[in-house]
């Protein structure tokens, strides 16, 4: 999975050969790939190989036992003929029949034993090999350099681990076992045929060669197109996961239909490639089913000639022909298993390519120097940097600077100037294209990467915490040393680090203290709490170098003060490099470096640079807050603020930490809510019939195609009873005495001709089955994916607040669950229907010919069916457990990939892999018992058929001895019913498919049945029915836009014990700007969420021009609103796509787009790119800096020309210069619209018409900037804390 090149290659004239080589190896890995393992079996251990060898031998022996049937059958025919000729007495007939019937019993016992051992062994080793492959793949991913991830499709890793690995595991377990058994049956049958009479076997052998060649060539063609289809399905999975991860912005912009169309477009491309593969498979299956009829025709025709010449006996002709029959049906069974195996091979090839890629920045290798001491002196010497994924832009140009040991160095500058890139170079996330980065005089490229990162601690603007306890998260900072400490020592060290980070007090106040789970992404904690836990995590390793990248920019003033105090303490006695936009945080730095467009423009201390009145002084001036000189803060103003650090939710309940005493209560409430909304997908139990009915309803549009395919399936099933009539008739004919040989030859020619005709009809029937039903199945899978994706995208935010509805889990439903449901689609249903028609027709035929023997044989079929049904139930339970484990492991792997920079920075690769292996091993231990039971039932369903044969022959011989039945009657009953019994057993080879489909249908039905209370049911579906008459009143367009919160109270569904807003009443007049300020957790962003109708108030109303917003059409309402949030979302695609994303379906000229870019202060950057607006931004905007992404989001909002503008920390990621320009543009466009701002940086709100100070969801203060300063209250304290002096 080497990332593709996404941007144009740099002009060769700009780069020398060395620079091109540096970029190339970061994109494509080092030359001379590691020794690549050829297939999944290379991941088997010695014990696995022993078990696999024994299992393979048992599978071969099980397959080889089947052709012994013709031998026993030939002996019985000889006895029957002898009785008819008078050479065998009735008592002798009964005795020999009983003996030969016992042979069938012995055959059944042997087949059961061998099948059981083979099945258990393959399931056991297959699970272990797939587990090893999963682990190795994830290890290979975690080894890769950052450029690899910059171009990696969103959701691709999760899709590989969840869906593709499941296909591989299935291929090397049940499918491989079935295929080996079938191959052994075919080979043994071929040998038996040669032993019986080699000439006849030699005559028909070309047909076997044709069948093998057909499978080989057809399989290669199928793999090629199936591989392309899998690549496209992986791409579609990436689109889905990216959309679900950004669901709030998707909802706000109303782009559900746009993303659904993009998703569907890729699915259609995948379906085209898949259809080519399926058409070839259809031809192969039809040919394999038709070919045996030609073999019958030729075998009987040739056999009759040798019989009349006296070179063969009747027993040899019948035994040879029956052996050929068994061998041909074995080849038919090979095809579907080979298809699954080849699919697994194709997928494994892509996985092995990723595993074989050699990373130029591998954290797990032992190479590189490890100096015994570190001083911490960092020097960049004439460093140039070009990102491999954006090789047309110089990020750093000839930068030389020094970060002195044990000193605090700050780097400031405009957005995109290269500040964070310097930190990336120090961490060795990227390689410089020129110059060197030195640590204590050593080139860091010569140092061991893992050792280097252990000396460094990084604290980001948005710190990543993992879904674990606070204790575990802090210990992740020194994961390599934890094993050396006792539990008490671990806790002591964590407490010490927490005290240094100013985090111990709030952690101790929690009910579970350091053992409190922080939730996914740490969202159970506030922003300030997360930041302080991240600082503690950084300090526990006692790093020599501390990197702080906008560590306080996302915090309110009070949280910033507490975190800044912790950072100041952390910076003591170590080299510290700070990247910051808020200059108040770096005034005390020992050295300040100012960057502009990748170059150093100024250096010095804060006071020296201010005195120069240059670029730095201009930045300082822009961050001053007016009028504070008239209202000085008293001494200790910072300390006067209460330690209330709970953070407001970012459009969701997950980010707001509740009162600590209520945590357990809320967890129970969450579980209950999840159950009530139907999100507990495993709680719904669907039977196989319900699953089939569900699939039928989904396939209603294609009923004509389905009807055609299923009709052909019934006709195809009837060909086997017809074969039994032909077979029994010919066996009777070839028993004629020598005087009747001319008649024998004539009738054999006639029946052989009928076999040839049956070949053509069988081929046509099976082609109709496979082509029609595979087409319908593809349509089913595409429709399910589309409907589920649309359903997910229109759900209310409360749905996504439920922990089980993570992007990875929902993406899994769209990929693996859809595939599993399709596994019980057309071809499988057609196969089952074919087998049922064969069984029923066989029973009817046998009853018509010889009802006594037919009733006895038919009575045994339910036993076979019961064994298969029990196996299905066991597999259903087993698959449920495996599925849950797969979701858990895939979700964890997805979390690691999404947070790979944090994983790399902390050196967590080995720890993460160990935990991942633990998740997989835990499930493997649980599944062993189910494997043992399921294998026993499967072996029983495969071997009981020979007990049926024993009974049939014994009772048939008794009827012949008593002259009640002729040999023809016994032959036709035996062939039709024993074949029917075998086919009844074959139905349950589809048990794994049915089991997976049953579980998948539960998940998919839950998704489809979800009914959002706010959003429309589906973008293209009918609008939801409204209750009452009030909601049916005419819609009004947003015009004057007077916004009023009328006594609004609200509690997040996922946080039912605490009110986010409490009786809030605020009015914003048309055209006014309202600023919402306050501490984290005060309810500011909740107001934005309610205005966007992500949620509806519990009490009160929100009015627009006097009308409740709940009475408006939600899509029309949101079109007149633009949201710019701190959490900037950039979608994969071009800059143009991202700016126009909120105007889906509307014609927008480039001039309009460029004007919006100019307003957002990003025009110069866009025009500097070779591809301009057509430049690809990478996954999640990975090609852009944080400020550039924010300005694109602002340009997007400007272009929508909204009537209501919502700004939630819209400029928090911008440098002072960009912020001033963008703020000026915002001030200009606010004149014609109502604006509601949420801000921590108070310099951005001082010109607002109304400023509301919120606390604990209530309105604390209201007024203008000057009025609130005059009150010397809460707002005055906040302003005083942010002023620069």
From Swiss-Prot:
**Membrane-spanning parts:** 57-77, 102-122, 176-196, 203-223, 281-301, 312-332, 707-727, 753-773, 831-851, 855-875, 931-951, 968-988
- Molecular function terms from GO: ABC-type transporter activity; ATP binding; ATP hydrolysis activity; ATPase-coupled transmembrane transporter activity
GO cellular component terms attached to this protein's record: membrane
Residues forming the ABC transporter domain are 380-622, 1043-1281
> What are the residue boundaries of the ABC transmembrane type-1 domain, all occurrences included?
54-343, 713-996
Keywords noted in UniProt: ATP-binding, Glycoprotein, Membrane, Nucleotide-binding, Repeat, Transmembrane, Transmembrane helix, Transport
Say what the protein does.
ABC-type transporter; part of the gene cluster that mediates the biosynthesis of the isoquinoline alkaloids fumisoquin A, fumisoquin B and fumisoquin C; as well as small amounts of fumipyrrole as a shunt metabolite. The products of the cluster lead to a brown coloration and are important for growth and conidiation. FsqE possibly plays a role of self-protection.
Coiled coil (residue ranges): none
* Glycosylation-annotated residues: 467, 1037, 1138
Is Ribonucleoprotein one of the keywords UniProt gives this record?
no
Give the primary localization class.
membrane
Q: How does it sit in the membrane?
A: Multi-pass membrane protein
Q: What is this protein called?
A: ABC-type transporter fsqE
Recorded superkingdom: Eukaryota
To which pathway does this protein belong? Secondary metabolite biosynthesis
- Name the encoding gene, please: fsqE
